[in-house]
Regions:
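Acidic, glycine-enriched active-site microenvironments
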Residues: 1-12, 18-228
């Protein structure tokens, strides 16, 4: 059927396909720019219509959610890293560390592996030990002040990486709407920076769909069925 084939098109085996996208429950306005951010995906997708989309940017290494998980492990925070880092960041000094944003050839592409390495090197320097990652010894040496300061610095930089590329895509393509989907869409720092960067109201996939891929796929199939 039409909805089934549409879902297959969207969630196909091609790893570049926007698996984590759930279009908003109300009628979306096209053209639509989607930022898909999760443990498995960091993608910018431009939709001209349902099923008519173009991948314009993606991570060249770690997905942003994966970077959150790895950094959480480095500084001794639990899994999943996203919520743990967001909570620790509330207690940190955002000026404590200046972390790098990767410069890439792809205009809308992301990279987080250099940021993760910068966190590791900074923590090694701060504790005076060069334990490698992953290591149980390193997080044990991280005190609360370092943990909180690194959490807020990493979160700010990772989010700014996403927001800068999303703003560049928005400015160039002038979409009618912007949608954020995936587990990292729940991050409040991401929402704050996007509000400041974009002159448009941003729509978010429902939180329950942000973290449950099966529910997202079902929602997408249902939505397609309504319009076919």
């Amino acid at each position: 059927n039409a909805s089934g084939s549409a879902v297959r098109k969207t969630i196909g085996t091609d790893e570049r396909s926007p698996v984590h996208l759930a279009l908003p429950q109300n009628q979306p306005t096209f053209p639509l720019l989607a930022l898909i951010v999760s443990g498995g995906h960091s993608q910018l997708v431009l939709f001209q219509n349902h099923g008519d989309y173009q991948l314009i940017g993606q991570t060249q290494d770690d997905a942003v959610g994966e970077a959150f998980d790895k950094v959480a492990k480095i500084i001794g925070l639990p899994y999943p890293g996203g919520p743990a880092i967001a909570k620790a960041a509330e207690l940190g000094d955002p000026r404590a560390f200046h972390l790098p944003i990767a410069k890439l050839a792809g205009e809308y592409d992301f990279s987080f592996s250099g940021l993760k390495t910068a966190v590791l090197r900074t923590v090694q320097r701060e504790v005076g030990k060069d334990f490698t990652f992953p290591s149980h010894e390193l997080p044990a040496l991280v005190n609360d002040e370092l943990r909180h300061n690194m959490a807020v610095s990493f979160q700010y930089t990772a989010v700014k990486t996403l927001v800068d590329k999303t703003k560049k895509a928005y400015d160039n393509f002038q979409p009618a709407s912007v949608v954020i989907a995936g587990g990292v869409a729940a991050n409040q720092e991401l929402r704050r920076q996007l509000r400041e960067a974009l002159p448009i109201d941003i729509e978010y996939a429902p939180i329950q769909l942000c973290t449950d891929n099966a529910a997202m796929i079902a929602a997408l199939g249902y939505f397609r069925a309504q319009i076919d």
